[in-house]
């Protein structure tokens, strides 16, 4: 009987140690998350965002490296900005940069609906009145503002995420790849 009590007490003590260790890990994780959040806010990765934009808009792909004005310097700045962010927070910083880039992209007027309100402007080419989507060139949106073709935004967002996921590899920093599709991260 005494051995059962000793065994039970030892098991209870081990469980308490495990629980306190888990609580410590949880509080350490919260601290690290807050620290990362601050670090990510302080490091917007502006040069990386410009590299991403140049890559996606084609301003960088069709010129030889030596003819790209500032492209090499911009990549070096991007790599330096990535190195300035701690290893643990790099992927979160890249995710935030991509999210910021996505939020700045104009949304297409798909199927004639305005992305900012519930007003209907007519489908692509459905009206000859001025100001409708599809009037003139396929790049003009309502009242002539620049818009992307329907579906192009989704493709561009996917490419942005794929390219951004490879930035650490391009800069030779750890981790070599980041999951840009992770939700709920800064």
Curated annotation (Swiss-Prot):
Pfam families: Glutenin_hmw, Tryp_alpha_amyl
Keyword Secreted tagged: yes
Cellular compartment(s): Secreted
Keyword Oxidoreductase: no
Residues covered by region (Disordered): 108-155
GO molecular function, a single term: nutrient reservoir activity
GO cellular component labels: extracellular region
Residues annotated as signal peptide: 1-22
Keywords tagged on the record: Allergen, Secreted, Seed storage protein, Signal, Storage protein
Ranges of compositional bias, category Low complexity: 110-149
UniProt similarity note: Belongs to the 2S seed storage albumins family.
Cited function: Seed storage protein.
Designated name of the protein: 19 kDa globulin
Organism in which the protein naturally occurs: Oryza sativa subsp. japonica (Rice)
């Amino acid at each position: 009987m005494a051995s059962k009590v000793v065994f039970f007490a030892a098991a209870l003590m081990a469980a308490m140690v495990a629980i306190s260790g888990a609580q410590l890990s949880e509080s350490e994780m919260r601290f690290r998350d807050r620290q990362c959040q601050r670090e990510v806010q302080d490091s917007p990765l502006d040069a990386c965002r410009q590299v991403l934009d140049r890559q996606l808009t084609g301003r960088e792909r069709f010129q030889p490296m030596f003819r790209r004005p500032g492209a090499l310097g911009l990549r070096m700045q991007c790599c330096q900005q990535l190195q300035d962010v701690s290893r643990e927070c790099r992927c979160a910083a890249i995710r935030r940069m991509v999210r910021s880039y996505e939020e700045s992209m104009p949304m297409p007027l798909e199927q004639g609906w305005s992305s900012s309100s519930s007003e209907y402007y007519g489908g692509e080419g459905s009206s000859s009145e001025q100001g409708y989507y599809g009037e003139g060139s396929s790049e003009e949106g309502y009242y002539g503002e620049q818009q992307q073709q329907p579906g192009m935004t989704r493709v561009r967002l996917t490419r942005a995420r794929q390219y951004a996921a490879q930035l650490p590899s391009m800069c030779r920093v750890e981790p070599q790849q980041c999951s840009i599709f992770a939700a709920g991260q800064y």
